[in-house]
Amino acid sequence: MPNTPDRKYKRILLKLSGEQLMGDEGFGIDPKVLDKMALEIGQLVGIGVQVGLVIGGGNLFRGAALSRAGLDRVTGDHMGMLATVMNALAMRDALERSNISSTVMSAIPMHGVTDQYDRRKALRLLDNGEVVIFSAGTGNPFFTTDSAACLRGIEVNAELVLKATKVDGVYSADPMKDPTAVRYSKLTYEKVLTEQLGVMDLTAICLCQDHNMPVRVFQMDKQGALLNIVVGGDEGTLIQGKETEEA
C-alpha cells in the first residue's frame, strides 16, 4: 500500500455490528476495540474521506430474540434502538479521544444526549470533515440496523455502504460450518435476493437495489482492510447491479 494513498471514495457509510464492540468480553463494550476502530476511521478522515457510521446494538440487546421469548416485538425493537445509542455514544467518546470530531444523531429525539437526526445538518457536518454516527436505527420497529445503514447512506449521498463482518466477504454457505464454502468476489443484488445469501436482511438489499447503492462486505478485523477499500483495493465481496462497473 502506498505511503500517501489517494482516496477512491469521497463519502462512505460504514456499518459495524454491535457484536464487534464486545471484543473477547462476550458482552458489552471493550474499550480496546473502540480505540482500534477509532484509529482505523481516523485513517480515512486523514486522507479526506467523509465517514457516516451506523452501529448495531446486538452486544447489549436483541429485540428480535427476546420477542420470540415472549417480549412484545415493538417494545423489544425500541429497547434495541436505545442500545445502538449507547454504542454510538461510546464510539463518539473513542473518536474524540483520538482528536476526531464526531457527532451522534438519533432517529429518536433524545434532547441533551444526542442531536436529533437532520439530513441537512448531517450533510454539513460530513462536508466539514466530521464523523457522523447515526443511531436508533430508522426510528421505527421491524427495521434492522442494516436497513438503517443503507437508508442513511442513500440519504447522505454516500458512494458506498461498507458492512464490516467477522468473515472476509460473502460465501456460498457458512464458512464456519462448511469448509467447501466458496467466497464471492462480486455479487448482484438479484443473486443475493434469489439465493437469500444472508448478507443483509432483504429489505436493506432491496433498498440498495432500488437506489443503485453498492455494498461491500469485508472483514473489519483484517488489518488495513478498511483503508485499502477506500483507496480502491479489492477486499471482501462487492454487491451491485448487473450493469454497474467496479465500485
From Swiss-Prot:
Pathways involved: Pyrimidine metabolism; CTP biosynthesis via de novo pathway; UDP from UMP (UMPK route): step 1/1
Keywords tagged on the record: Allosteric enzyme, ATP-binding, Cytoplasm, Kinase, Nucleotide-binding, Pyrimidine biosynthesis, Transferase
Nucleotide-binding listed as a keyword: yes
Highest taxon listed in the record's lineage: Bacteria
Cross-referenced Pfam families: AA_kinase
Regulation: Allosterically activated by GTP. Inhibited by UTP.
Binding locations of UMP: 57, 77, 138-145
GO CC terms of this entry: cytosol
Self-association and partners: Homohexamer.
UniProt name for this protein: Uridylate kinase
Organism of provenance: Saccharophagus degradans (strain 2-40 / ATCC 43961 / DSM 17024)
